[in-house]
Amino acid sequence: MGASPIFYLHSMHEGVQVSSKLEQLQALLAPVVEGLGYQCWGIEYVSQGKHSVLRIYIDKEGGILVEDCEAVSRQASAILDVEDPISSEYTLEVSSPGMDRPLFTLEQFASHAGEQVKIKLRTPFEGRRNFQGLLRGVEEQDVVVQVDSHEFLLPIDSIDKANIIPSFD
């Protein structure tokens, strides 16, 4: 069997407004989370019409308890009330990343190489937005995923959402 074909997607970043909002929220909230002794695994801001959801994923060695989420929620709420970065109504959720943990950064993708992932792109590539396969790793600013016998290089900026698919073996 010959070498697997490699596909590369280059995408201009859409959703700049959401991206800058996420960057603003990350800059505001990551120090709060880390100051409490947790890792800020990632932040999601999902606008759903008049109402939005702000999710903060936290992690630490040994796992996360409900009390950990409460502590981060209290501190994050206080900062959000003072800084007021979100003008519309929203719900704040604080959670552990869980078994199907979302992946946000190149470092997270690299550390989970060898695991099965589900990736959704912002815009279609090769007629598809959804990829499910083996996470091969990272090359520069690209996430490498193998779907069947095809390898795809997906720029981190083109990824809308990515999650680990838990293995129950």
Curated annotation (Swiss-Prot):
It is found in: Cytoplasm. Gene3D superfamilies: Ribosome maturation factor RimP, C-terminal domain, RimP-like superfamily, N-terminal. Its main location: cytoplasm. It comes from the Bacteria. GO terms for cellular component: cytosol. Keywords: Cytoplasm, Ribosome biogenesis. InterPro entries: Ribosome_maturation_RimP, RimP_C, RimP_C_sf, RimP_N, RimP_N_sf. GO terms for biological process: ribosomal small subunit assembly; translation. Signal peptide: none annotated. It holds the Pfam family RimP_N. HAMAP family: RimP. Required for maturation of 30S ribosomal subunits. This is Ribosome maturation factor RimP. It comes from Pseudomonas putida (strain W619). The gene is rimP.
